Structures are given as C-alpha cells and as structure tokens.
C-alpha cells in the first residue's frame, strides 16, 4: 500500500446507495453489446485505474493477477495502478480518465466530463463503462472498509455506523480476497 488515503464507506447509507445503483444497472450486462464494448482486457484496465485511485490492496492484487492472466504486460499494469495513462491506446484513454475522475469524486462526476465521454463513445457504451466503474468501486470500498477496520486505520471505528458498514462490507471483501488467491 502506498501513502495515499484509502477510500472506504463512511455510512450504511453510502453502502446501500451504491449497492442499489449497482443492482439497478445489472441488466446492462445481459445486453449483447456489453461484451463487445467492454472486452476482458478493457474491463481489467478499468478495474486497475479505479483500484489505483481508491488504493485498494485486495482489488489491486486481484486485478493484477487477472490482468496478467489476460495477457497484459506488467509495466502497463503498474502504470494503471499508479494513475499513469500516457501509454494507453487512444480509444481507451478517455474511459480510463473518466473512471479515475469518478473515483476521485467519490463515485460522482462532473456533467461536462460525462458529456465529453458520451460524445466520444455514445450513451450505450458509457452506460457499460459506468456499470464497470460501479462494480469495481463498490468492491474497492468494501475491501478498504474491512481493511481499515481491521488495521485500526479509521478514527471512530467503534462508532455504530462504521461497525454496521464494516459488517455489510465483509462478505464482498471476503470474496474479493478469496478470488485473489
């Protein structure tokens, strides 16, 4: 883990809002265009870009492993985790900048940034990119919440709100850690 501040859930409401938006977006993954627009290596690049911003140790490890399995080079993986997108293909760079922007804004985005990416990719593909972002970001926050709670990194971690969100995040963090082994 580097010295960046971990992003984690601060309340059960934040957890449930992101979880609900993820559930509502799930039907997008059944659309045939999803697999064409978000091919496996591109999805890993999105995951690495988001995990680099949230500084998630579990997810960085998992997505490094799966990226290597899908044929990505170590240098490219490290660059994405470090937030360096200069050597990314022109067709992928806007999406990766966009998901980094969203992770920096705690899942939000500026309307101008979203409009620029819609102009570049079209609304359907941006919907797919948004879904990928939400899935990865949710996993990152769950993992970081558990990590932060376990390693005494959160002031007020005995607070009822934090304890509740910690326990809500445990199953997701468990499956991410299990997947990275």
Give each language-model segment a name.
Residues 1-181:
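Hydrophobic alpha-helical segments
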């Amino acid at each position: 883990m580097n010295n960046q501040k971990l992003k984690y859930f601060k309340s059960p409401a934040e957890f449930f809002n992101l979880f609900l938006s993820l559930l509502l977006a799930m039907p997008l993954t059944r659309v045939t265009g999803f697999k064409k627009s978000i091919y496996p290596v591109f999805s890993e690049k999105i995951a690495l870009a988001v995990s680099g911003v949230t500084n998630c140790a579990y997810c960085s490890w998992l997505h490094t492993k799966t990226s290597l399995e899908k044929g990505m080079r170590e240098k490219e993986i490290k660059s994405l985790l470090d937030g360096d997108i200069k050597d990314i293909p022109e067709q992928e760079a806007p999406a990766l900048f966009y998901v980094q922007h969203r992770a920096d804004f705690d899942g939000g985005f500026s309307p101008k940034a979203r409009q620029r990416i819609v102009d570049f990719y079209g609304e359907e593909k941006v919907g797919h990119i948004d879904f990928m972002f939400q899935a990865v970001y949710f996993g990152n926050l769950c993992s970081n919440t558990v990590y932060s709670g376990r390693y005494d990194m959160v002031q007020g971690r005995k607070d009822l709100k934090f304890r509740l969100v910690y326990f809500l995040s445990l199953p997701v963090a468990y499956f991410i850690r299990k997947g990275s082994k």
